[in-house]
Structures are given as structure tokens and as C-alpha cells.
């Protein structure tokens, strides 16, 4: 005996499942996570040109050493919080509140030719962001501290796409 297939129920179930899947994907990648292919060398060697970055948009609490995506897809490492004093000397040594931070960055921190003057106190509601490749000064050294509401997300992991 053949059973009669109810096409309306079948198509309705497929439509509901497809709609739920689309909603879950929209919430995941439109609200919670941000996917971006990184272009540039200012975060080398931590983040390389062509890496796929996944950042968490919901995080609004950022600590020192967090790598964040901000402004128009810029990526940088937070080195100072609101109220901290940042100083960079002529030898390329950075001091936060008078102390040299324990960093694994192999590059000296150079001053920007134009930009802020030192010592610099990070304003309330902002963070001081530096590139890992410290010769590239397109970060807080040129553009002042970044407002926390301009941070798009905290980098939670990345996928190397070339040049392992």
C-alpha cells in the first residue's frame, strides 16, 4: 500500500527549517561574530596578510594585550587603559605608568613623526592601541587613543590562509 505524501506539510517543514537556519546564521555572523580577511603587515608576525580573523562583537570589556578590530578594519593590540600614562623614549622603549610592559613583540616602538606628545594620558572611555609591527605608526601614536565604542570586536581566533 502506498502512503499519500502531503506536499504542503513537506514544503512547509523545509521552509521553516531553512528560515530557522538563516536566522541562526544571521544572528551568529551578523550580531555575535565578525569575519574579516586581514590585509596588511602592521600586525606581523601575530596576524599575517591573508589571515581570516574571527572576532567577538559582544565583548565590551577589553584588557591589555587584547587584539581588537576597530575603525575601518584596522587591527591592533591594546597596551593601555583609561587613565594610564604612556611614554615612548627615543630608544624605542615604551613605558606604561612608568613601567616597561612584559611584551613578546620583537620590534622597537618608534614615535610617530606627527601625532601625540609624550607622556600621554589615555582619556576616559578610550584605550591606547599599538600595532605589533611597531615601525608602522598608523595606530594610537598618530591618531590618539581609540574610543571603546569604536572597537568592533575582540579577536578570538584566526585561520592562516597562506604562508604557514
Q: Model-derived features: where do they sit?
A:
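Protein maturation boundaries and topogenic segments
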Residues: 1-76, 143-164
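Generic structural signal for buried aliphatic residues
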Residues: 53, 68, 86, 127-128, ...
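Short, surface-exposed secondary-structure boundary micro-motifs
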Residues: 58, 73, 91, 99, ...
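Glycine/Thr-rich phosphate-binding loops of Rossmann-like dinucleotide-binding domains
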Residues: 63, 104, 137
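Short glycine-/acidic-enriched loop or helix-start segments at secondary-structure transitions
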Residues: 64-65, 98, 139-140
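Structured, soluble extracytoplasmic/luminal domains of envelope-associated proteins
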Residues: 81-129
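Beta-strand-rich cores of mature extracytoplasmic or soluble domains
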Residues: 114-164
Amino acid at each position: 500500500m502506498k502512503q499519500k505524501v502531503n506536499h504542503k506539510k513537506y514544503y512547509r517543514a523545509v521552509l521553516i527549517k531553512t528560515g530557522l537556519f538563516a536566522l541562526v546564521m544571521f544572528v551568529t555572523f551578523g550580531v555575535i561574530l565578525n569575519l574579516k580577511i586581514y590585509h596588511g603587515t602592521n600586525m606581523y608576525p601575530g596576524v599575517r596578510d591573508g589571515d581570516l580573523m574571527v572576532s567577538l562583537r559582544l565583548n565590551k570589556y577589553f584588557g591589555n594585550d587584547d587584539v581588537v578590530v576597530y575603525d575601518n578594519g584596522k587591527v591592533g593590540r591594546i597596551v593601555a587603559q583609561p587613565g594610564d600614562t604612556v611614554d615612548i623614549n627615543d630608544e624605542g622603549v615604551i613605558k606604561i605608568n612608568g613601567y616597561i610592559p612584559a611584551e613578546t613583540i620583537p620590534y622597537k616602538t618608534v614615535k610617530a613623526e606627527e601625532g601625540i606628545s609624550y607622556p600621554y594620558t589615555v582619556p576616559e572611555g578610550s584605550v591606547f592601541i599599538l600595532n605589533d609591527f611597531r615601525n608602522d605608526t598608523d595606530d594610537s601614536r598618530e591618531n590618539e587613543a581609540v574610543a571603546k565604542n569604536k572597537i568592533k570586536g575582540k579577536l578570538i581566533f584566526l585561520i592562516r590562509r597562506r604562508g604557514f
